[in-house]
């Protein structure tokens, strides 16, 4: 059976409940912490390193929850939410490839913020290039990523690391 190469919001929410990739595969967060509305493309051999890529989007509207509290009279999307979306996508990629377990962010090499997401923006686009995939006792993905708002790059991150664990009780 061929794997899907794009996903809707409904499918991503189903992933958060264990109903898309399978019950033992990494899950996405749901509700407010799911920072992705759709995956436009996902593949195992594309991207800058030929090891996979993901392009995903988040629709921006003035009524998103974080604009009411970050900050009063100066609404801006928290940078950490964009970074978390990148980690979410690396974990999703590993589950899409077949990894089983629970995903955990393990770190990032460097993050740069050169812009902001304001309530009048329309769309955030995440672009991830998978650099390395480890599928042994340790399952880990490493990626470089950018985040654009309305076509302008405003975040970049190198060496985003996500691990997949069968037991997180001692993590």
Curated annotation (Swiss-Prot):
Pathway: Lipid metabolism; fatty acid biosynthesis. Its main location: cytoplasm. One of its GO terms (molecular function) is (3R)-hydroxyacyl-[acyl-carrier-protein] dehydratase activity. Gene3D superfamilies: Hotdog Thioesterase. GO terms for cellular component: cytoplasm. One of its GO terms (biological process) is unsaturated fatty acid biosynthetic process. Keywords: Cytoplasm, Fatty acid biosynthesis, Fatty acid metabolism, Isomerase, Lipid biosynthesis, Lipid metabolism, Lyase. It catalyses: a (3R)-hydroxyacyl-[ACP] = a (2E)-enoyl-[ACP] + H2O; (3R)-hydroxydecanoyl-[ACP] = (2E)-decenoyl-[ACP] + H2O; (2E)-decenoyl-[ACP] = (3Z)-decenoyl-[ACP]. The keyword Isomerase applies. It is found in: Cytoplasm. Its EC number is 4.2.1.59, 5.3.3.14. It holds the Pfam family FabA. Signal peptide: none annotated. The active site is at 70. InterPro entries: FabA (IPR010083), FabA_FabZ (IPR013114), HotDog_dom_sf (IPR029069). Necessary for the introduction of cis unsaturation into fatty acids. Catalyzes the dehydration of (3R)-3-hydroxydecanoyl-ACP to E-(2)-decenoyl-ACP and then its isomerization to Z-(3)-decenoyl-ACP. Can catalyze the dehydratase reaction for beta-hydroxyacyl-ACPs with saturated chain lengths up to 16:0, being most active on intermediate chain length. Homodimer. PANTHER family: 3-HYDROXYACYL-[ACYL-CARRIER-PROTEIN] DEHYDRATASE, 3-HYDROXYDECANOYL-[ACYL-CARRIER-PROTEIN] DEHYDRATASE. HAMAP family: FabA. Belongs to the thioester dehydratase family. FabA subfamily. This is 3-hydroxydecanoyl-[acyl-carrier-protein] dehydratase. It comes from Shewanella frigidimarina (strain NCIMB 400).
């Amino acid at each position: 059976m061929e794997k899907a190469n794009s996903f809707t919001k409904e499918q991503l929410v189903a992933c958060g409940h264990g109903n898309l990739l399978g019950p033992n595969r990494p899950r996405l967060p749901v509700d407010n912490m799911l920072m992705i509305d759709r995956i436009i493309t996902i593949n195992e051999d594309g991207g800058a390193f030929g090891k996979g890529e993901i392009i995903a989007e988040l629709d921006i509207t003035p009524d998103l929850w974080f604009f009411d509290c970050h900050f009063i009279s100066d609404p801006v999307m928290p940078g950490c939410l964009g970074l978390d979306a990148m980690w979410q996508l690396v974990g999703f990629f590993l589950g899409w490839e077949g990894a089983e377990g629970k995903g955990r962010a393990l770190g990032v090499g460097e993050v740069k913020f050169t812009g902001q997401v304001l309530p009048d923006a329309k769309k955030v686009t995440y672009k991830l290039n998978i650099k390395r995939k480890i599928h042994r006792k340790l399952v880990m993905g490493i990626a470089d990523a950018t985040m654009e708002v309305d076509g302008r790059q405003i975040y970049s991150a190198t060496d985003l690391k996500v691990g997949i664990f069968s037991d997180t009780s001692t993590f």
